[in-house]
């Protein structure tokens, strides 16, 4: 399913004709340039590889420079891939713009969530705190028991414990497109999308729409 690579600009609000305020996230989608077309015969699956934005020349290594030069496209800030459905055809060097979403009502947005560093179980997993008083000493935000005794004699995999929180790939599904601004290459999406301002996001038509 074809999507677009954008950059999260921030949040604002727009008003309907009735005066209702809608909170929106602004996503800037510069033209996505196709750097490679993968086919069933040569690669084992059908997909397009796209790049977006720009990158300083001294930040582009030789492998990337050769790859972009072969495709005849300007080096971008990264490379992303979209699987192709049956019968879809694209040419290397062509561009994808926000107009791809003119007829789309709902989208799924994927980004990298804000990193929170090492966090305890209360913040990371919404554990309840223990008593502040009534004889409780130094165990107010402690997780409590993490298992049983000699049997099984170990902590089960997946046990919710303190650790690194955030900075992981997150997808928010079924967000509504409020406006497509083709002149300024902007998508206005209702609600919040994952990640920090300036972060890369992948916008695709909703799979559950």
Swiss-Prot record:
Gene3D superfamilies the UniProt entry points to: 3.30.160.810, Translation factors
Disulphide connectivity of cysteines: none
SUPFAM superfamilies in alphabetical order: Translation proteins (SSF50447)
Post-translational note: Methylated by PrmB.
Pfam families: Ribosomal_L3 (PF00297)
Annotated PANTHER family: 50S RIBOSOMAL PROTEIN L3, LARGE RIBOSOMAL SUBUNIT PROTEIN UL3C
Family assignment from sequence similarity: Belongs to the universal ribosomal protein uL3 family.
Name the record gives this protein: Large ribosomal subunit protein uL3
Gene name per UniProt: rplC
């Amino acid at each position: 399913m074809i999507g677009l690579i954008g950059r999260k600009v921030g949040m604002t609000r727009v008003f309907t004709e009735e005066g209702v305020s809608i909170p929106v996230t602004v996503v800037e989608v510069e033209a996505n340039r196709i750097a490679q077309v993968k086919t069933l015969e040569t690669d084992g699956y059908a997909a397009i590889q796209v790049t977006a934005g720009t990158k300083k020349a001294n930040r582009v290594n030789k492998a990337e420079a050769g790859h972009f030069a072969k495709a005849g496209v300007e080096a971008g800030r990264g490379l992303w891939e979209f699987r192709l459905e049956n019968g879809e055809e694209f040419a290397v060097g062509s561009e994808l713009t926000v107009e791809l979403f003119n007829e789309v009502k709902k989208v799924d947005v994927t980004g990298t969530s804000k990193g929170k560093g090492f966090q305890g179980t209360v913040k990371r997993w919404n554990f309840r705190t223990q008593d502040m008083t009534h004889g409780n000493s130094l165990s107010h935000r402690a997780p409590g028991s993490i298992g049983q005794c000699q049997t099984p004699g170990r902590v089960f995999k997946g046990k919710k414990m303190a650790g690194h929180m955030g900075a992981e790939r997150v997808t928010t599904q079924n967000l509504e497109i409020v406006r497509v601004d083709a002149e300024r290459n902007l998508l206005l999406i209702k609600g919040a999308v994952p990640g920090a301002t300036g972060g890369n996001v992948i916008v695709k038509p909703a799979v559950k729409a």
